[in-house]
Amino acid sequence: MFDISFLFIGINSILTLLGCFINLFLCYLAIFQSPKAIRTYSLVLINITLTNVGACVTGFLLDQRIIQSGKSMLYVSYGYCSLLGEGFCFNIFAAYLHFHTHALWLLFLSFVYRYYVIIRQEPTKKVLQISVVIVYIPSLIQLISMCLQEMNFDELRSLSKEVVPQYNLTGLTITGSLDFFTFAPFYCLVHMAIISFLIAIGIHILRKMIINRMVLNGVDVTIRSRNLHAQLLRTLSFKATVPIIYYFGCIFFILGRIWINPIFEFSIFVPTVIVPVLTPLSAFIHVAPYRDFVSKMFHGRPKNKTVNSICIIPIISH
């Protein structure tokens, strides 16, 4: 009989390795190929790519599923973190979750930055760096609280035999939480689901406000800068759909509470490995300097684009 775990392990491995490569490449472009008009913003982009790399590396090390029973959650790891024991696997899991929440906060900061540039002026690099640190605080609290969480690994393994006696989990690393209403797992759950939902709403509100400002009032920048800002907005508009992908994971999480099924248990993590692959692709497609660099790599010359002042309206209206 086919073991479904091999399918999900393969999906996880391919997507996380692909995500590492794509994000490292975009990080290189953001550092060395960003035009002056978006060089300050590239600081946020660099942080996003490095956060995505962290999510991909930890995801590759985990290869995890979640088994739920009442107030308890069991995390079963199939990845290389198992070589260093349960404690290491759990800390990797804590890092994995905090990378994803921080990436969402950085996405929110991206929209705040674009709106601020339109209504005032571009902030200094120092202000932007401080902003990145501030939005990291909620995810840092989540990481520290989870790493300091105490757990009895023998008790968790015994619980797994009671909850899912039909599963053969011999030799696998089992961590988790006996009561997710304790501070660390509950804070993580609220941060991943409720606060992330509010961030997603804020992102879509900001996107609409940015479009209204640019279309109705115009932007006091040069023609070339207007085009670059419009391209960035197309990128951010694509990224605004990213939080929706996370909620497929929430759906599988809820289904996993109702039915004990390995497909639901593995599928909780599939959306979280898809997101770091999709988010950088938008920059390759919509930001002309990056797109031209990639086109030149593969075709020997960039695609010719006509830049003019009227192209901004159709670009931001999609």
Curated annotation (Swiss-Prot):
It is found in: Membrane. Keywords: Membrane, Transmembrane, Transmembrane helix. Pfam families: 7TM_GPCR_Srd. It comes from the Eukaryota. The lineage of its organism: Eukaryota, Metazoa, Ecdysozoa, Nematoda, Chromadorea. It comes from Caenorhabditis elegans. SUPFAM superfamilies: Family A G protein-coupled receptor-like. One of its GO terms (cellular component) is membrane. This is Serpentine receptor class delta-7. The chain crosses the membrane at residues 6-26, 42-62, 92-112, 127-147, 186-206, 236-256, 258-278. Belongs to the nematode receptor-like protein srd family. It is a multi-pass membrane protein. InterPro entries: 7TM_GPCR_serpentine_rcpt_Srd, Nematode_rcpt-like_delta.
